[in-house]
């Protein structure tokens, strides 16, 4: 497997890999990583669909990319997906997945057309004082010292950040800024999370720094993530004869480990609670989704809280990874990520408006018609003075194809599940859906004497507790996550958010899909390049632009410095003034 960039590799079709007709594939899970791997097995690996098996412990595929209506409970979306125009693997695959709505078009086609016609941007990124515009006004509000802390982190070698927290590299100069408000709520970072991952995010999305304040860097699907992303992949795979095995738990994978060689030998299953085994040869490839950010999820209802129960159950992704990791140190250290659910949890809630009484309060903040079918909030709106650090969003409506006319479906999340609310004086994790809605309505500016009535009769709210939703953000060191294909592995790979790949960032659709593609290309030795992570971190134009954007448009020559440094800077500017370098610095407003 090798990386590539440019159209030469992007538009090429690889030859059929040698011996692929004698091979079979078994995939643990049906999340985005596993579905991506299966699609690449079909498209580029040219493996027969009937040789490909996906094991799903539940009745529905999709993993964390869900979106459904639970009978008697209501619509539920545990999370949302923010996409980027440089998710190179995602677009490489989705150009080949047919649209379910537009004949002759791909998922990429309809996504591209949609976001061209209706580009995303926010008209109100944050509120305070019960629904009043916080007037962050597109500003980062970073001091010179805060900017220097970001720059220092950007250039710090990875190994110096192993097992370090963000609090080890930033102080109040960053934490009190609008930058941190935007960043932590957009990506769900907590102060105690990994400084290494923070650095990787900075480098990965340096080309989008200017789009952080109003979220114009983002792109969204037409419907919820399940209907817009997962379902087209399922239909593609089913159309090629790929076999899905539901209500099938993978309880263990047994390996034969010899010097210089690692081989998966047996898959242990529970199929409808009956034990089964699949014996493996070198021609039987296994793709393992280890860990899981939505394991131990609980769903509440309008009248019931979502219970916080982080117990790791047999047959889930963490239990499986622990059993696998016990067999070889190259298989990672799951305990680094799943041992402290108080530091890895947050809550979300899906709110459905039942009439038009709440709509004016939404419209007052987003400054758009929520029923237009176009962008509504343009990403999350954060109540910056919320005790729960509450954020909420309404994407294009309807969010579900079967959504009743006149209803809106939106999403709320709180980063702090264990602190009291501002109207509901108890932690979010102890609240029913109705109570979470009441807290949200309070921060929308609804008159207090109307809040309970609206929450009870004009909305249905379903809370979700996810104890391990940011487990991958915990501080880590080399070897904590297994390589996609560990050294010496002959017939297996790790895929998903807890597999290690170069330069990309976790908690993204692209990361899951990249690991799936890399796994297939490595094990089948497909002769085509995997598109590399977009190289903006090496593009001087993006670096110069970000340096000025982070200072809210002020040139670097305005940095506070003593007279000696100012004199030296002036002399340096004089030397490059009539050169291409000088013109570049002027173009990007560095000087």
What residue ranges belong to the model's regions?
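Extreme N-terminal leader/targeting segments of oxidoreductases
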Residues: 1-25, 43-51, 550-591
């Amino acid at each position: 497997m090798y990386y590539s960039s440019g159209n030469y590799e992007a538009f090429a079709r690889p030859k059929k890999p040698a011996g692929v007709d004698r091979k079979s594939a078994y995939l643990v899970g049906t999340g985005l990583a596993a579905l991506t791997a299966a699609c690449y097995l079909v498209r580029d690996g040219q493996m027969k669909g009937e040789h490909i098996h996906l094991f799903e412990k539940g009745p529905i595929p999709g993993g964390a990319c869900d979106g459904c209506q639970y009978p008697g409970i209501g619509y539920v979306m545990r999370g949302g997906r923010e996409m980027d125009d440089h998710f190179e693997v995602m677009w490489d695959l989705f150009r080949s997945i047919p649209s379910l709505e537009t004949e002759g078009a791909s998922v990429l086609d309809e996504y591209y057309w949609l976001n061209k016609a209706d580009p995303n941007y926010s008209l109100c990124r944050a509120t305070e004082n019960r629904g009043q515009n916080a007037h962050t006004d597109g500003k980062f509000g970073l001091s010179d010292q805060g900017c220097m802390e970001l720059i220092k982190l950007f250039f710090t070698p990875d190994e110096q950040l192993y097992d370090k927290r963000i609090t080890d590299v930033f102080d109040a100069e960053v934490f009190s800024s609008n930058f941190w408000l935007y960043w932590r709520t957009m990506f769900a970072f907590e102060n105690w999370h990994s400084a290494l991952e923070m650095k990787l995010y900075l480098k990965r999305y340096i080309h989008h720094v200017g789009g952080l304040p109003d979220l114009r860097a983002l792109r969204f699907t037409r419907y919820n993530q399940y209907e817009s992303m997962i379902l087209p992949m399922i239909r593609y795979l089913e159309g090629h004869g790929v076999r899905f095995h539901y209500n099938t738990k993978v309880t263990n994978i047994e390996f034969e480990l010899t010097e210089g060689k690692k081989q998966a030998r047996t898959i242990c299953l529970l199929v409808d609670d009956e034990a089964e085994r699949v014996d493996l040869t070198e021609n039987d490839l296994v793709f393992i989704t280890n860990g899981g950010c939505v394991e131990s999820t609980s769903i509440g209802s309008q009248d019931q809280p979502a219970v916080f129960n982080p117990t790791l159950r047999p047959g889930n992704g963490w239990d499986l990874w622990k059993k696998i990791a016990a067999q070889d140190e190259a298989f990672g250290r799951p305990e680094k990520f799943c041992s402290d659910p108080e530091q890895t949890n947050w809550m979300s809630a899906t709110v459905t408006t039942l009439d038009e009484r709440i709509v004016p309060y939404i419209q007052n903040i987003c400054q758009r018609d929520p029923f237009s079918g176009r962008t509504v909030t343009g990403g999350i709106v954060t109540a910056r003075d919320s005790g729960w650090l509450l954020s909420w969003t309404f994407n294009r409506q309807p969010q579900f194809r079967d959504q009743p006319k006149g209803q809106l479906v939106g999403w709320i999340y709180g980063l702090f599940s264990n602190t009291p609310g501002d109207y509901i004086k108890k932690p979010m994790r102890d609240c029913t859906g109705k109570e979470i809605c009441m807290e949200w309505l309070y921060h929308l500016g609804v008159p207090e004497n109307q809040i309970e009535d609206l929450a009870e009769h004009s909305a249905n709210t379903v809370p979700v507790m996810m104890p391990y939703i940011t487990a991958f953000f915990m501080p880590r060191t080399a070897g904590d996550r297994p390589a996609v294909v560990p050294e010496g592995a002959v017939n297996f790979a790790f895929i998903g958010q807890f597999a290690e790949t170069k330069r990309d960032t976790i908690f993204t659709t692209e990361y899951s899909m990249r690991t799936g593609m890399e796994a297939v290309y490595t094990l089948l030795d497909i002769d085509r390049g995997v598109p590399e992570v977009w190289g903006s971190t090496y593009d001087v134009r993006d670096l110069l632009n970000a340096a000025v954007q982070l200072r809210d448009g002020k040139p670097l020559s305005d940095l506070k410095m003593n007279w000696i440094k100012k004199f030296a800077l002036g002399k340096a500017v004089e030397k490059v003034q009539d050169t291409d370098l000088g013109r570049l610095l002027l173009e990007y407003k560095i000087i």
